[in-house]
Amino acid sequence: MQSTSIHGSVVIASDADLDVAVSSLVPVLDLVETEETWDRIDHALAQFQILTKCGATKVPSYIMRVHEFAPCISRSLLSDRTRLSGTASDVLNSMAPRLGECFAPFVNVFIPPLLQLCARTNKVSLRRAEKSLHLICRHCHLPYILSCLVHALKEKSSSLRASAAECMVIYMESCDLSQLQKRVTDVEQAIRLLATDAHPQARATCRHLYGLYAGLFPERRATCVILCLHTAFSVHFLQQRNVTLRRFNL
């Protein structure tokens, strides 16, 4: 039976409670975003966030419900409507710290659209996406997150690369050694990519990232430095070659 919290919200204590609470949200979160529907979708997402904060993450069927609502959450994250996008981010901000490592099924569902927002010129969208990513990196400690971030470091957007680099630092600061050992090669690849990044903020973050890495894996430092030097030399060689080819119209 549902009980009520001091602020009047329903406390979710069982799968049955959650089923009742989301019954009115399901048809709304299946809607396509239009001028007529977006406000209803926004309200439904806000209601789901309240349920998330009121115990829903502790009942087994919550994960199933997130899978069900994931398409709507992802679409809303990428919406051009700032309010709707912000509400979708708020859902993740409440979800990730409470789920922790149980967030695993949603890494490849929600991380890509959040990273996509980091490539946008809208600063509000960028900061919101970074906040969500930081919370996920800080609380979820899932190795696959690193693979997503390394992939982002190869993209053209400088703001995306800088955001991904900062997420790498937060992830390393939040995880213990045993968790990081599983994906240390991802960290090393990130350092090599960032060491030659054109964006000054990304290079500055690389120094911080390397400092964390060197402290945790002192026995691997020498190899990493050699690989970084090799990468830097290769990049410089290619740049000089391209300059020469252009100069002689080759």
PLM regions and their residue ranges:
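Short acidic, glycine/proline-enriched loop segments that cap or flank alpha-helices
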Residues: 57-61, 156, 175-182, 197-201
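Eukaryotic acidic, Ser/Thr-rich intrinsically disordered low-complexity regions
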Residues: 2-7, 188, 192-250
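N-terminal "cap/leader" segments of large eukaryotic alpha-helical scaffolds
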Residues: 1-56, 236-250
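Core helices of alpha-solenoid repeat scaffolds
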Residues: 15-29, 51, 59-74, 92, ...
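Short inter-helical turns and helix N-cap capping residues of alpha-solenoid HEAT/ARM repeat scaffolds
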Residues: 36-37, 80-82, 121-123, 156-158, ...
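Active-site loop segments of alpha/beta catalytic cores
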Residues: 103-106, 118, 122
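Hydrophobic residues within the alpha-helices of tandem HEAT/HEAT-like
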Residues: 47-53, 73, 77, 87-99, ...
